[in-house]
Amino acid sequence: MKTVSQISELRAQVKAWRQQGLTVAFVPTMGNLHAGHISLVAEAHKHADKVVASIFVNPMQFGVNEDIENYPRTMINDEQKLTAAGTDLLFTPSPDIIYPKGLAKQSFVEVPNISDGYCGESRPGHFRGVATIVCKLFNLVQPDVACFGLKDYQQVQVIQRMVEDLSMPITIIPVATIREESGLALSSRNGYLTEEEKAIAPALHQSLHWLGEQIRAGYAQQDSIDFIGLAKHAAKTINDAGLHTDYLHVCHAETLQPASEDDTQLVILAAAHCGKARLIDNLQVNLA
């Protein structure tokens, strides 16, 4: 694996591949990699000849109360994992490379409506930062495909909408969430959990699974489904386990608007605090 930090080096390598007629897949990350990230690289290999990954802790997507300085940085281990996964090129720019004029003077990308609720409401400006850095990285790498984990379901929908609205010739590949045996979704944030907290954290996914089963049962029996009431019950179960629910909603799987009884493609979106960690998870419910 080749590692570069300059835009000119990145573009030169991608240009050389293009001249050979090779296709390119892209996996953007913020580092502190786990098996979920590596599954994105594995999926990327299925769709292109060469795989580019990036590691960049993006200051634009951190809020005023989120400490970017304490975000885990594990570059040596990350490089080893990406090399073992067969990554061809790693791009590791500094903030000065990405935002040479500083954040205050940086143009930005904002994806309306779909960015507004859920994590967008809990973390104002977060998806503006995500959309901006992903758009910029897409312009730099110019991949044929890009892989994103479905654990961050709203993020995937935001990026998909951005690609569609801006007519980017890039296929977005959503990749299934990798979980621990307990059902807890793998996340860089899990490192903040104590052993006691790690024991109760799976209550988040367990409650989503219960809620999904209730929705499927109601649909099968052609009953009226009280999405809001069921979601409140699931949130109470999460809180009773010792977590603090940030939000839990049943939504249309594509628009992320509140679910209606006519919808057959649903997603349950949730976030909860467990100690110092803010955990997010989701469950897709297909009723068709």
Swiss-Prot record:
CC annotations in GO: cytosol
Entry binding sites for beta-alanine: Q61
E.C. numbers: 6.3.2.1
Molecular-function annotations in GO: ATP binding; pantoate-beta-alanine ligase activity
Acetylation recorded as keyword: no
Pathway note: Cofactor biosynthesis; (R)-pantothenate biosynthesis; (R)-pantothenate from (R)-pantoate and beta-alanine: step 1/1
Subcellular location: Cytoplasm
Binding-site residues for ATP, renumbered to this chain: 30-37, 149-152, 178, 186-189
Top-rank lineage group of the source organism: Bacteria
Broad class of the protein's primary localization: cytoplasm
Keywords: ATP-binding, Cytoplasm, Ligase, Nucleotide-binding, Pantothenate biosynthesis
Membrane-traversing stretches: none
Catalytic activity reported: (R)-pantoate + beta-alanine + ATP = (R)-pantothenate + AMP + diphosphate + H(+)
Xref: CDD domains: PanC (cd00560)
Biological process per Gene Ontology, one example term: pantothenate biosynthetic process
SUPFAM superfamilies: Nucleotidylyl transferase
Catalytic residue list: H37
Residues the record lists as binding (R)-pantoate: Q61, Q155
Similarity remark: Belongs to the pantothenate synthetase family.
Functional summary from the UniProt entry: Catalyzes the condensation of pantoate with beta-alanine in an ATP-dependent reaction via a pantoyl-adenylate intermediate.
Other facts noted in the record for this chain: The reaction proceeds by a bi uni uni bi ping pong mechanism.
Subunit structure: Homodimer.
HAMAP family with a match to the protein in the record: PanC
Record-given protein name: Pantothenate synthetase
Species this chain originates from: Colwellia psychrerythraea (strain 34H / ATCC BAA-681)
